[in-house]
């Protein structure tokens, strides 16, 4: 089975240079507390439930051939283990309260979709960004097929990655992708495990590999009070020291937001980021100046 795509976002302006199409692949090895695309974490299809649209008529409960839908205390619930994605509940829901995320493409069909906006790429210096989930933790024959076909058509290819994938995957893609948008969240390993569920050893190793191979790298840092932002800028200073020896084109500082919070209800999952906060504008400017003082081309935002 080919990797699943949860969204092909057209006219994106925050995922690399110019106007771009961003392909969001499904499946990620990290579980970041602040993740704004929680439906992208699993590698399988999922049914999303929009409670605001649901009239509680219970037609879906009665019609589901696999008995996967049941009435909970306050809303209609779904047993994902029983669901076979037959779409019967979608067909019978007059309010469109359910949708399935995760669509399979062939390499050729996906590139055809990407190519539809080619005129915008050419006019703006844009292209396609392969994102996720985690694009580098997918079937790499498929991903390399997409990259190579796009490159053969003159389409600029960026890779948006959290860095947590096999090192050989990065070695394989380093010479054919035009740009890596590489997330660095924390240098402190214990904190990284606490907030993402995984060690950062592999992430820090892979960005060094890309640098050694001469890849074009833009570092992207989500800035979150209580995670990697504090009064003394301790974690930020660690990041700067780590990045100094590397071949880095630019640094993007991404202030925390919770605009994806509503998605958690749709997959029957609790949002664990309630206590997280966005840094003040003054703190963002302070951190920006720290990076600039070490000669990094730095901006706030994507």
Swiss-Prot record:
Q: Which UniProt keywords apply?
A: 4Fe-4S, Iron, Iron-sulfur, Metal-binding, Oxidoreductase, Repeat, S-adenosyl-L-methionine
Q: Name one GO molecular function term.
A: metal ion binding
Q: Which SUPFAM superfamilies match?
A: 4Fe-4S ferredoxins, Radical SAM enzymes
Detail which positions bind [4Fe-4S] cluster 2. 54, 57, 60, 93
Q: Does the keyword Metal-binding apply?
A: yes
EC number(s) on file: 1.97.1.-
Where does this protein hold [4Fe-4S] cluster 1? Answer: 28, 32, 35
Where is each 4Fe-4S ferredoxin-type domain found? 45-74, 75-103
Q: Which GO terms describe its biological process?
A: 4-hydroxyproline metabolic process
User: Which free-text remark accompanies the cofactor?
Assistant: Binds 2 [4Fe-4S] cluster. One cluster is coordinated with 3 cysteines and an exchangeable S-adenosyl-L-methionine.
Binding locations of S-adenosyl-L-methionine: 34-36, 133, 183-185, 257
> Which reactions are catalysed by this chain?
glycyl-[protein] + reduced [flavodoxin] + S-adenosyl-L-methionine = glycin-2-yl radical-[protein] + semiquinone [flavodoxin] + 5'-deoxyadenosine + L-methionine + H(+)
Instruction: Please report which protein family the annotation says this sequence is part of.
Output: Belongs to the organic radical-activating enzymes family.
State the function annotated in the UniProt record. Answer: Catalyzes activation of the trans-4-hydroxy-L-proline dehydratase under anaerobic conditions by generation of an organic free radical on a glycine residue, via a homolytic cleavage of S-adenosyl-L-methionine (SAM). Is involved in the anaerobic degradation of 4-hydroxyproline.
Designated name of the protein: Trans-4-hydroxy-L-proline dehydratase activating enzyme
Organism, by scientific name, is Clostridioides difficile (Peptoclostridium difficile)
Which gene codes for it?
A: pflE
């Amino acid at each position: 089975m080919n990797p699943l795509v949860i969204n092909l976002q057209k006219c994106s302006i925050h995922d690399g240079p110019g106007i771009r199409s961003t392909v969001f692949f499904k499946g990620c090895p990290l579980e970041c507390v602040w993740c704004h695309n929680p439906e992208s974490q699993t590698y399988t299809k999922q049914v999303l439930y929009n409670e605001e649209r649901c009239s509680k008529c219970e037609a879906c409960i009665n019609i589901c051939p696999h008995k996967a839908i049941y009435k909970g205390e306050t809303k209609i619930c779904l047993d994902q283990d029983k669901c076979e994605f037959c779409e019967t509940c979608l067909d019978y829901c007059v309010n469109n309260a359910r949708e399935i995320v995760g669509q399979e493409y062939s390499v050729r069909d996906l590139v055809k979709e990407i190519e539809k906006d080619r005129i915008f790429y050419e006019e703006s210096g844009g292209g396609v960004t392969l994102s996720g989930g985690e694009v580098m933790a997918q079937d790499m024959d498929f991903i390399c097929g997409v990259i190579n076909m796009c490159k053969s058509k003159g389409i600029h290819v960026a890779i948006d990655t959290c860095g947590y994938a096999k090192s050989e995957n990065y070695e394989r893609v380093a010479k054919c992708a035009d740009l890596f948008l590489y997330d660095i969240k924390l240098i402190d390993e214990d904190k990284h495990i606490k907030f993402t569920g995984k060690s950062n050893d592999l992430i820090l190793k892979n960005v060094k590999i890309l640098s050694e191979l001469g890849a074009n790298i833009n570092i992207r840092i989500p800035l979150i009070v209580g995670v990697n932002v504090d009064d003394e800028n301790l974690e930020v200073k660690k990041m700067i020291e780590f990045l100094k020896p590397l071949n880095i084109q630019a640094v993007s500082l991404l202030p925390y937001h919770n605009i994806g919070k509503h998605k958690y209800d749709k997959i029957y999952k609790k949002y664990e980021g309630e206590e997280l906060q966005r840094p003040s504008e003054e703190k963002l400017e302070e951190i920006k100046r720290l990076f600039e003082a070490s000669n990094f081309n730095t901006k706030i935002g994507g």
